[in-house]
């Protein structure tokens, strides 16, 4: 695609343009008509982020029209700067007549295409969890995500039994706890459910002192070791489906969490009891939707907790992590914690950690034309040949954009 007009050229630009120039020239020398029309992408966060940083602008205090005008001037300036640089590289092209995505004629064509897509039912507005950058306050596509290794505190949290539906009346309900595991402490205020695998065996484990914990049978030894519990016994076991629709008390908010079933629950990590917050995860969202539960998104555009989070309202997600952790330690809700390093998504523009958050967005549905796109792959000569299978696989796995 075309480069962003958001700064000076770098070595990546030089490499990309040189390769393109070699291809264009070699075909022209073989008698093909291969005019190269240079172009620039003048829209999007790369432009906004660059001008805010370079000109020290506060876009929230500027009228929208003024900010757009500033971005337009900034983009045009770097079109001129980059064009001069590409020409100095000796790249062959119609530099006097480039295409710019900010030209009104170009934008008009985009609106026409968008209109046709809407008329065909490809465009819809929905509330779904998406990658969200609190720093740039924008949704991100999967292609705009970069993963980095970050230190993280993982927690094992007790959710006391609230309603066992009469199935465990022979046990002391006041001592029963479901134990969940999460690497994102800040999502706990958004918890609405605990997901179990319907067929896997879950154990009721009694520790010295009488407190009982419910977790997946294959993970008992590992979890109890992490919790520093040396002496315990398995009282009874049941399949996950046995616990469906029971209720647990939230560890620090005045509400309950529903026990639900999900096939994606695995036995390779955690406790087998999956913390489920529909506003912060795609699987969580779909599971709670299936059970007819309301959507709760207790974090705003800037990554701050809303009033729904109680005493943590106004805190940024990263600020709330140690506070929530300390509160759970003090209240006894924390079963255990560990320090780990894990791969975590970051914004490709600002390089800061992002969150997964449900927000109203316009989506392009790709289901209706996946087959057509795959069929079109057959009409292309692929070099190397394995590119076709790779492209087909990518198309089939593509979610709504």
Q: Where in this protein do the model-derived segments appear?
A:
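N-terminal, positively charged nucleic-acid-binding surface of large information/translation enzymes
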Residues: 1-210, 277-290, 294-309, 321, ...
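Short glycine-enriched loop/turn motifs at secondary-structure junctions
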Residues: 174, 267-271, 357-358, 385
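Short, basic/low-complexity N-terminal boundary segments at the transition from targeting/disordered tails
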Residues: 180-183, 217-233, 318-332
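Protease-associated
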Residues: 189, 193, 200-273, 282-286
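Generic structural signal for alpha-helix starts
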Residues: 216, 383-384
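A glycine-biased structural micro-motif
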Residues: 243-245, 311-321
């Amino acid at each position: 695609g075309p480069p962003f007009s958001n700064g000076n050229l770098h070595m990546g630009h030089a490499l990309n343009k040189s390769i393109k120039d070699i291809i264009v020239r070699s075909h022209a020398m073989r008698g093909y008509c291969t005019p190269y029309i240079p172009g620039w992408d003048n829209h999007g966060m790369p432009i906004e982020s660059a001008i805010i940083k370079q000109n020290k602008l506060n876009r929230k205090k500027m009228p929208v029209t003024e900010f757009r005008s500033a971005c337009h001037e900034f983009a045009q300036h770097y079109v001129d700067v980059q064009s001069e640089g590409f020409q100095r590289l000796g790249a062959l092209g119609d530099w006097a007549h480039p295409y710019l995505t900010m030209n009104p004629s170009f934008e008009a064509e985009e609106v026409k295409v968008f209109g046709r897509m809407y008329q065909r039912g490809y465009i819809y507005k929905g509330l779904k969890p998406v990658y969200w950058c609190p720093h740039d306050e924008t949704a991100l596509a999967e292609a705009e995500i970069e993963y980095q290794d970050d230190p993280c505190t993982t927690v094992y949290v007790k959710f006391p039994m609230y309603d066992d539906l009469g199935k465990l009346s022979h046990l002391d309900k006041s001592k029963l706890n479901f134990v969940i595991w999460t690497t994102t402490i800040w999502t706990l205020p958004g918890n609405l459910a605990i997901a179990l695998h319907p067929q896997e065996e879950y154990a009721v484990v009694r520790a010295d002192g009488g407190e009982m914990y419910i977790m997946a049978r294959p993970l008992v030894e590992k979890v109890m070791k992490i919790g520093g519990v040396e002496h315990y016994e398995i009282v009874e076991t049941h399949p996950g489906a046995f616990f469906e629709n029971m209720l647990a008390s939230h560890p620090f908010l005045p509400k309950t969490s529903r026990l639900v079933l999900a096939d994606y629950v695995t036995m390779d990590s955690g406790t087998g009891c999956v913390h489920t917050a529909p506003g912060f995860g795609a699987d969580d969202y779909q599971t709670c939707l299936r059970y007819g539960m309301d959507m709760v998104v207790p974090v705003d555009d800037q990554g701050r907790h809303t009033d729904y989070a109680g005493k943590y309202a106004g805190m940024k997600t990263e600020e709330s992590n140690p506070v929530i952790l300390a509160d759970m330690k003090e209240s006894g809700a924390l079963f255990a914690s560990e320090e780990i390093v894990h791969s975590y998504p970051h914004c490709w523009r600002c390089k800061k950690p992002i969150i997964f958050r449900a927000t109203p967005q316009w989506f392009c549905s790709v289901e209706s034309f996946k087959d057509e796109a795959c069929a079109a792959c057959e009409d292309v000569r692929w070099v190397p040949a394995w590119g076709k299978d790779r492209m087909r696989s990518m198309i089939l796995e593509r979610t709504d954009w």
